[in-house]
Swiss-Prot record:
Species this protein is from: Paracoccus denitrificans (strain Pd 1222)
Pfam families given in the database record: Ribosomal_L4
Any one Gene Ontology cellular component term annotated for this protein: ribonucleoprotein complex
Family membership: Belongs to the universal ribosomal protein uL4 family.
Its biological purpose: One of the primary rRNA binding proteins, this protein initially binds near the 5'-end of the 23S rRNA. It is important during the early stages of 50S assembly. It makes multiple contacts with different domains of the 23S rRNA in the assembled 50S subunit and ribosome.
Keyword vocabulary terms for this entry: Ribonucleoprotein, Ribosomal protein, RNA-binding, rRNA-binding
Subunit composition and interactions: Part of the 50S ribosomal subunit.
Gene name in the database record: rplD
Gene3D superfamilies: 3.40.1370.10
NCBIfam families (alphabetical): rplD_bact
GO BP, sorted A to Z: translation
Any GO MF annotation of the entry: rRNA binding
Protein name: Large ribosomal subunit protein uL4
Length: 206
């Protein structure tokens, strides 16, 4: 598929041929869902924790005699049945991550790129070269192009001036091509790729 290439100041800079195997697929919601779930589960801290029966600080003395009180048989004040007792089978620190085959991850990225292309939310710019690392320059480019919440993906390395200038802008994320991932692509309204970014992604996903 062919796509127009623009400059940062919204001028024309020719066109580019995008691989149909990467940008022209019919997006599959099930694949995207699987990959996003995998990403979010891997990022989850898993630090949730409660005190169990063995963790609660109480005397281990039997609270009252076994027989003759008319009450139920109890040995420990730590039991979950008592107020301030331990929690039965409560959450403990653990990893929520699970495995997902590399082929599924790569296919998910292709479908995320295809989804943006199909929705008309994919933009290709010539380069991210700016003279100085000035936030105003990037803010002007974002405004002129009508971008609201945007993810910008460059080649192997992001233009340093652009990355520094974009740091203070809310709703503008900048990644190198190796950092491209399904979750970040889908959570932003517009995906902006540089020519170098397109080449790097196509080489990565061949």
């Amino acid at each position: 598929m062919k796509l127009d290439v623009i400059t940062l100041d919204a001028g024309k800079a020719g066109d580019i041929d995008l691989s149909d195997d990467i940008f022209g697929l019919e997006p599959r919601a099930d694949l995207l869902h699987r990959v996003v779930r995998w990403q979010r589960a891997k990022a989850q801290a898993g630090t949730h924790s409660v005190l169990g029966k063995s963790d609660v600080s109480y005397s281990t003395k039997k609270i009252y005699r076994q027989k003759g009180t008319g009450g139920a048989r109890h040995g420990s004040r730590k039991a979950p049945i008592f107020r301030h007792g331990g929690v039965y089978k409560g959450p403990t620190p653990r990893s929520h991550a699970f495995d997902l085959p590399k082929k599924v991850r790569a296919l998910g990225l292709k479908h995320a790129l295809s989804a943006k292309a199909a929705a008309g939310e994919l933009v290709v710019v010539d380069s991210l070269n700016i003279a100085e690392a000035k936030t105003a320059a990037v803010a002007k480019a974002v405004k002129e192009n009508g971008w609201k919440r945007v993810l910008v993906i460059d080649g192997a390395e992001v233009n340093e001036n652009f990355a520094r200038a974009a740091r203070n802008l809310e709703g503008v994320d900048v990644l190198p091509s190796m950092g491209a991932n399904v979750y970040d692509i889908l959570r932003r309204d517009t995906l902006v790729l540089t020519r170098a970014g397109v080449e790097a992604l196509e080489a990565r996903l061949k």
